[in-house]
């Protein structure tokens, strides 16, 4: 065998060996990559509802008819489908005050309002329910006329932020109502003795202090800080840039679907009355009802038979 042939054989053997090493290395690398891919966890994308309530620090109060969330200086409300269109009452009460001449402790800020939340387009609308006209047995034409002439008032509109895919609940931003001054729920008095009061409230001066939610009611407690001015009729300024801190509690109550029977007023005194218009034989009569607690006999038959019955 020639020297050239031996050298050629050695080169061939070395090339084959190097090729085997290269193939083995590639195979090991391939299997490692394959194993690593098996252990990789897929990133789950959050929907809009989850992002809003998890990306920022959130305080919450959850109930069966409403849930409240405070996040990123906003107040969010979630209503389940069963609460949309339901009758509710909302009101505001003064819970604390730094200067009683500007607001009286324990009094209501505005009137208790009968409302409903309804969905319109991409918003949730708070409606003030119009119950001025009462018609027990309306005809089709009369019902249409009453709906046009005594329609509900669109009180506030809130943008829908997200929907809960699990429950169908609607999440919306209610900051424009709770965290702003409202002429329907005035906190600061407009007149203090002979002086006119002007108050300035800014969103950054409002702090939500507590959220609560129960079976059929919920409340939002907050602290509002105002800068006030008092001036007389002649324009002279009595107090200028006076800071006032007031605690306000908004309460929302879910009304029962089984409505109570109203009671007509009479000549007796000592009752608070609510005026109404009633349709009677195609005529509109003006009357009033007594404001009373819902106390009804548990056993109506026993009650009307003159026997005792527990109230419900």
PLM feature segments, named:
Residues 13-20:
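Bacterial N-terminal signal peptides
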Residues 25-29:
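Boundary at the C-terminal end of the N-terminal hydrophobic targeting segment
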Residues 30-312:
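Auxiliary tRNA-acceptor-end handling modules of aminoacyl-tRNA synthetases
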Residues 3, 20-24:
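Intrinsically disordered, low-complexity segments
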